[in-house]
């Protein structure tokens, strides 16, 4: 599997599991913390893409704001994901592995590869998905099995 396919597969898994998670969040009474965390995942995708494309507004973009209404999360998630799918699909492995620069939290000049930023977004999503799964469980709802292997393995006998 080449790098482009790997990253697209990772984003696809992340997309599927986050949308399943939204279905569970819909069942709980106190959604506030899950909404904040899910909004943060959306905002992170927007901010990191803005950094990659050298958007001058990237520095002012918040990791945590806006906090979307629950009913907006699915649509906003998809909107935040699409630029990543487009960017990865249009990029070569060499481009995905070449450093881009951006202004960091401390106004310093930082560098990272788009590949590593893409992986960060997906791994970061796993971290916050686990937090949301815990919140769901604490409110008496059994979370779905969303492990990556569950999308890949097959029973033979």
Question: Which residues are covered by each model-predicted region?
Answer:
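Short acidic/polar alpha-helix capping motifs at helix-coil junctions
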Residues: 48-50, 95-100
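Short, contiguous alpha-helical
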Residues: 8-65, 106-157
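Helix-adjacent hinge/juxtasegments
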Residues: 58-98
């Amino acid at each position: 599997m080449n790098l482009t396919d790997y990253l697209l597969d990772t984003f696809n898994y992340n997309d599927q599991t986050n949308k399943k998670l939204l279905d569970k969040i819909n069942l709980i009474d106190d959604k506030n913390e899950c909404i904040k965390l899910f909004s943060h995942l959306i905002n992170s995708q927007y901010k990191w893409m803005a950094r990659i494309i050298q958007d001058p507004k990237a520095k002012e973009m918040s990791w945590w704001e806006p906090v979307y209404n629950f009913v907006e999360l699915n649509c906003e998630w998809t909107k935040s994901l699409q630029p990543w799918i487009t960017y990865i699909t249009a990029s070569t492995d060499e481009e995905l592995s070449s450093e881009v620069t951006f202004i960091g939290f401390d106004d310093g000049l930082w560098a990272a590869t788009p590949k590593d930023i893409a992986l960060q977004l997906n791994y970061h999503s796993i971290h916050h998905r686990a937090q949301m799964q815990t919140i769901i469980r604490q409110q008496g709802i059994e979370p779905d099995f969303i492990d990556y292997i569950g999308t890949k393995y097959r029973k033979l006998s």
